[in-house]
A protein has these predicted regions:
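Short, structurally constrained coil/turn elements
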Residues: 63-65, 108, 179
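Active-site loop->helix "elbow" adjoining a glycine-rich segment at hydrolase catalytic centers
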Residues: 160, 189-192
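Bacterial N-terminal signal peptides
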Residues: 18-27
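Surface-exposed acidic, glycine-flexible loop patches that form ligand/cofactor-binding
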Residues: 74-80, 104-107, 174-178
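Alpha/beta-hydrolase fold nucleophile elbow
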Residues: 177-188
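Serine-hydrolase catalytic machinery in alpha/beta-hydrolase-like enzymes
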Residues: 82-163, 167, 171
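N-terminal secretory signal peptides that target proteins for export/translocation
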Residues: 1-11
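A domain-start/cap signature at the N-terminus of enzymes
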Residues: 31-83
Length: 193
């Protein structure tokens, strides 16, 4: 009996070990500087066999942040319930890494509409804008300034969420058969807040 219990815990221990190693690696990368080299042409510029792309520009209500939003729609007929849709933050970096091989894999199942929400820059990240857009307001005041060497205004996530919900999503989804029960929002680092 003991041997059976031991064998059944071994996979769990292995999974725990691998997840622990992954956590250590990822935590070391938190302190790494992002690669801020200018981006070249992306999949929307090159074209895809599996998706067709469009891009739209938006400005923040206060006019200080400028967004580029790419929409990738599968080249297949929408399911009866509509396409699932995935909004992805850090859209410039997403578009730089998105390729036809991944789009092919997505199109083999129920392909989602992909919406990459980025900024009007040729860099992978607009560090100041994303620090503001992706962070919640401090309880003591509406916006805050991160202190330290790289001071950035923060606390604009409510404004950004309102932009996503009231301007970007309605414009992107206009004319598309979308399954509103299968919407997702993806982000990492600040974008995961």
């Amino acid at each position: 009996m003991y041997a059976r219990e031991y064998r059944s815990t071994r996979p769990h221990k292995a999974i725990f070990f691998h997840l622990s190693c992954l956590t250590l690696i990822c935590s070391a990368q938190v302190y790494a500087k992002p690669d801020m080299r200018p981006l070249g042409p992306n999949i929307a510029d090159k074209g895809s066999v599996f998706y067709h792309f469009s891009a739209t520009s938006f400005d923040s209500v206060d006019g200080t942040r400028h967004y580029r939003v790419w929409t990738a729609v599968p080249n297949t007929t929408a399911p009866a319930s509509g396409y699932p849709i995935l909004y992805m933050l850090d859209g410039n970096a997403v578009m730089d890494r998105l390729d036809d091989e991944l789009l092919k894999q997505l199109s083999e199942k129920t392909p989602p509409v992909i919406v990459a929400v980025g900024y009007q820059t040729n860099l992978p990240f607009d560090l100041n804008s994303r620090a503001y857009d992706y962070t919640p307001a401090a309880e003591s005041r509406k916006t805050d300034l991160h202190s330290g060497r790289f001071s950035r205004k923060s606390g604009g996530s409510n404004n950004f969420r309102q932009l996503l919900e009231t301007r970007i999503a309605p414009k992107v989804e206009q004319g598309l058969n979308i399954d509103r029960q299968r919407r997702g929002l993806w982000g990492h680092s600040y974008g995961g807040l």
